[in-house]
Amino acid sequence: MILNFIYYFILILMVLLSIAFFTLMERKFLGYCHIRKGPNKTGAMGLLQPISDALKLFSKEMNKMFYMNKFIQIISPLIMILMMMMMWMIFYFSNNALNLNMSIIFFLCISSLASYAILFSGWSSNSKYSLIGSYRGFAQVISYEVSMAMILISLAIIPQSYNFISFLKIQETFPLIFSFLPIFIIWIITVLAELNRVPFDLAEGESELVSGFNIEYGSWLFAIIFMSEYGDIMMISFLTYYLFLGLKNLILFFVLILMTMIIMIRGTYVRMRYDQLMMMAWKMILPQSIIFLFLSYFIFLNINNFICINFCN
């Protein structure tokens, strides 16, 4: 038990270290998207920029306004990073004695709870801008959570298991992305909306003057929100690899491609209007997810009947 805790602690430590250099990679890529160089002054080729950013954020003073609900405002970012760390338990315990047979259900439960932290952080700031941003983010996450659950259930029909390891076993020779390319495209759209990334960053509005639900945050609390968001991006990249690209020898290559794709989307696409975002969630993504759920079930049923009729008798 103690050894498991030590291994998990090392995993979280490596994730937090990876987040630092992932932000550096994003800033470099965005710089080249804008035909300029990214951070290149701190250390050799800017490699020490994440360390300098961390020192700057954690050394700043946290401004506490008298109208804030201080306890909830402090606890909300801590809930965000705690949910992010709990999601990484899926990948650690998958290759361990504490294997989660219901890892898909565990992921859906944790991702649903994480949306409450956005609502609490916006409400506790007692600012109308942060409150509107938290309302938008909460409604967006709820809308796309349903489609995400439908996609995961439709994929879980194929290996007949809610364990992510079972997806790797059925993809040893042939990845599911070739058979389920439409579901993969819908999954990427849904994931970007869940992560509040461009072009669906309505909760935050990274390129605007008012930065959404986290406008009143600074110092170490802002750094914690920042780390939880980028930790979720890395976790979703691993999850997408498990679901669609399960070739064991190329795990780091595919995960890096997915992370780079999310960065390039931020540097390429513009933000959608909020009404278009909601209309796409309920009128386009959700009906298609339900159709794919029924198609997966009937395809699996017909394959089983074919095998039983031709080979079992």
From Swiss-Prot:
Major localization class: mitochondrion
Keywords, alphabetical: Electron transport, Membrane, Mitochondrion, Mitochondrion inner membrane, NAD, Respiratory chain, Translocase, Transmembrane, Transmembrane helix, Transport, Ubiquinone
GO molecular function terms listed in the Swiss-Prot or TrEMBL record: NADH dehydrogenase (ubiquinone) activity
Transmembrane segments: 2-22, 71-91, 103-123, 138-158, 173-193, 220-240, 243-263, 289-309
UniProt superkingdom: Eukaryota
Membrane topology value: Multi-pass membrane protein
Annotated Gene Ontology cellular component terms: mitochondrial inner membrane
Catalytic activity from the UniProt record: a ubiquinone + NADH + 5 H(+)(in) = a ubiquinol + NAD(+) + 4 H(+)(out)
BP GO annotations: aerobic respiration
The protein's Enzyme Commission number: 7.1.1.2
InterPro entries documented for this protein: NADH_UbQ_OxRdtase_su1/FPO (IPR001694), NADH_UbQ_OxRdtase_su1_CS (IPR018086)
Protein's cellular compartments: Mitochondrion inner membrane
UniProt-listed HAMAP family: NDH1_NuoH
Function: Core subunit of the mitochondrial membrane respiratory chain NADH dehydrogenase (Complex I) that is believed to belong to the minimal assembly required for catalysis. Complex I functions in the transfer of electrons from NADH to the respiratory chain. The immediate electron acceptor for the enzyme is believed to be ubiquinone.
Family to which the UniProt record says this protein belongs: Belongs to the complex I subunit 1 family.
Protein name listed in UniProt: NADH-ubiquinone oxidoreductase chain 1
Organism listed in the record: Rhipicephalus sanguineus
Gene label: ND1
